[in-house]
Amino acid sequence: MDFSPSSELGFHFVAFILLTRHRTAFPASGKKRETDYSDGDPLDVHKRLPSSAGEDRAVMLGFAMMGFSVLMFFLLGTTILKPFMLSIQREESTCTAIHTDIMDDWLDCAFTCGVHCHGQGKYPCLQVFVNLSHPGQKALLHYNEEAVQINPKCFYTPKCHQDRNDLLNSALDIKEFFDHKNGTPFSCFYSPASQSEDVILIKKYDQMAIFHCLFWPSLTLLGGALIVGMVRLTQHLSLLCEKYSTVVRDEVGGKVPYIEQHQFKLCIMRRSKGRAEKS
């Protein structure tokens, strides 16, 4: 049986195949377009891509880092920044020790000797009186800002424990040190705006400590925000890529029936031309 394009039967056979392919391909393409654009919202199915487990963990890590940095800002701000702001208000001056004294009444303190062990003890209160050269007044000397906050009556607050002799010997050593410096000027810090007679020997927090208190929490906050931002950017780029791929597939699918229809028309024109030549 002759199925060549020049025969009548071959012509009908080729035409039937092209029409069948055209009808099966075109409704499928139309159905896909109807699914994508039925509600007037193009590509609504691909608005949000499912995130992977790694992306979810990365986002959780970023938010955890940001929360931890906020907690660090709060803790360091209350424990270091606040005393530092009070410390920078103090100006340097020259002090001269007048006399030292250990109070007769020891002060109460608490200590821990284990997980569930707590005890009560007492420690000697050492007082160091100095003379400020700049204001020219008598003042009570403290070791640092923390000693002023814990007990403003004493030079320092030792670590509490049960050995009273050790606590007393430590206080006597400090008393002997200032007794030898009697009449010798040394540097100290006082607050001009405060009416209190409290001066400190050294500053506990310097500029470098404040730098670390602000740098590391800020770096943690920036790192967490960068992780979350990179994950969101990756998801957004994946979404754009998926949308672009879908649009390209739709365009290619719409061109296939048109090409087949054009081939069918060329076949009809050749058949008509062949009949005209025979007649």
Swiss-Prot record:
<dbReference type="InterPro" id="IPR003930">
    <property type="entry name" value="K_chnl_Ca-activ_BK_bsu"/>
</dbReference>
<dbReference type="GO" id="GO:0015269">
    <property type="term" value="F:calcium-activated potassium channel activity"/>
</dbReference>
<dbReference type="GO" id="GO:0005513">
    <property type="term" value="P:detection of calcium ion"/>
</dbReference>
<keyword id="KW-0407">Ion channel</keyword>
<comment type="subunit">
    <text>Interacts with KCNMA1 tetramer. There are probably 4 molecules of KCMNB3 per KCNMA1 tetramer.</text>
</comment>
<feature type="topological domain" description="Cytoplasmic">
    <location>
        <begin position="1"/>
        <end position="60"/>
    </location>
</feature>
<keyword id="KW-0813">Transport</keyword>
<feature type="transmembrane region" description="Helical; Name=1">
    <location>
        <begin position="61"/>
        <end position="81"/>
    </location>
</feature>
<feature type="topological domain" description="Cytoplasmic">
    <location>
        <begin position="229"/>
        <end position="279"/>
    </location>
</feature>
<keyword id="KW-1015">Disulfide bond</keyword>
<feature type="glycosylation site" description="N-linked (GlcNAc...) asparagine">
    <location>
        <position position="131"/>
    </location>
</feature>
<keyword id="KW-0406">Ion transport</keyword>
<dbReference type="GO" id="GO:0008076">
    <property type="term" value="C:voltage-gated potassium channel complex"/>
</dbReference>
<keyword id="KW-1133">Transmembrane helix</keyword>
<protein>
    <recommendedName>
        <fullName>Calcium-activated potassium channel subunit beta-3</fullName>
    </recommendedName>
</protein>
<comment type="function">
    <text>Regulatory subunit of the calcium activated potassium KCNMA1 (maxiK) channel. Modulates the calcium sensitivity and gating kinetics of KCNMA1, thereby contributing to KCNMA1 channel diversity. Alters the functional properties of the current expressed by the KCNMA1 channel. Isoform 2, isoform 3 and isoform 4 partially inactivate the current of KCNBMA. Isoform 4 induces a fast and incomplete inactivation of KCNMA1 channel that is detectable only at large depolarizations. In contrast, isoform 1 does not induce detectable inactivation of KCNMA1.</text>
</comment>
<keyword id="KW-0812">Transmembrane</keyword>
<feature type="transmembrane region" description="Helical; Name=2">
    <location>
        <begin position="208"/>
        <end position="228"/>
    </location>
</feature>
<feature type="topological domain" description="Extracellular">
    <location>
        <begin position="82"/>
        <end position="207"/>
    </location>
</feature>
<keyword id="KW-0325">Glycoprotein</keyword>
<dbReference type="GO" id="GO:0015459">
    <property type="term" value="F:potassium channel regulator activity"/>
</dbReference>
<dbReference type="GO" id="GO:0006813">
    <property type="term" value="P:potassium ion transport"/>
</dbReference>
<dbReference type="GO" id="GO:0005886">
    <property type="term" value="C:plasma membrane"/>
</dbReference>
<keyword id="KW-0472">Membrane</keyword>
<comment type="similarity">
    <text>Belongs to the KCNMB (TC 8.A.14.1) family. KCNMB3 subfamily.</text>
</comment>
<dbReference type="Pfam" id="PF03185">
    <property type="entry name" value="CaKB"/>
</dbReference>
<dbReference type="GO" id="GO:0019228">
    <property type="term" value="P:neuronal action potential"/>
</dbReference>
<dbReference type="GO" id="GO:0001508">
    <property type="term" value="P:action potential"/>
</dbReference>
